[in-house]
Amino acid sequence: MGNMDVMKIENLTKQYKGFRLDNVSLRIKPGEIVGLVGENGAGKSTLMKAALGLIRSDAGQVLFWGQPLQQNSVEIKNKIGVMLDESGFYHTMNAQEAGKICAGIYKDWDSAKYETFLNKYGINMKKPIKDYSKGMRVKLMLATALCHGAEILILDEPTSGLDPVAREEILEDFKEFVSDGKKAVLISLHISSDLEKIADEIVFIHQGRQVFTKSSREICEEGGVDMIMNEYVRGKSI
């Protein structure tokens, strides 16, 4: 697929009563990690869900490798790893059973890689998911997202509930994921310093509107994500 954008969002809009995701555009090239920042309720999760077709958008277009998700849907969906929360499996299951379900869904499921990630993350394959900590459930969802041949990961707060050591480990996994220059990641993180470490570009969304898209280098030179966001919210120009 050469240098074609892995994902391209053009003028995506979603209207709810009392909230509007307004005309958001971004593009993710092979080898890139693009981060979303903004206050709770800014529209980051809405953007991800609309991009994936989980909710219907009111306007705009989303392309994966130049194609709408509706075309060749199964083929494209097999190449997308998604984590929007940590509750993707029935909590009465264990990790081994979750892996068997994934093997039946994804044609490129890698059982050996899955077991490697479970061991790396310290996940007991036989322990019921209902007995996991929140951090362990997050790690399980990440393991499944990383093991089915995905070429783009779309991740909403994937490090939520993790201790600093586990966060660092998983951030390194994301960088490793894109290191071949072919894959990509769209990610939101509540700890902006983590995003500055791994993202190539950062998109700031405030009250449903896209304020800017800038490189991490630019943002760090201007004082960091938190400083820029706070100045904007206080009414200063970006």
Model-derived features: where do they sit?
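Helix-to-loop junction immediately C-terminal to a conserved catalytic motif
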Residues: 52
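Catalytic Walker B motif of ABC-type/P-loop ATPase nucleotide-binding domains
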Residues: 153-157
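Conserved ABC transporter NBD signature motif
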Residues: 60-71, 75-76
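The feature captures the beta-strand-to-loop junction immediately N-terminal to the Walker
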Residues: 37-39
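Helix N-cap at the start of a conserved alpha-helix in ABC-type nucleotide-binding domains
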Residues: 164-166
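Conserved beta-strand
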Residues: 9-12, 19-29, 60
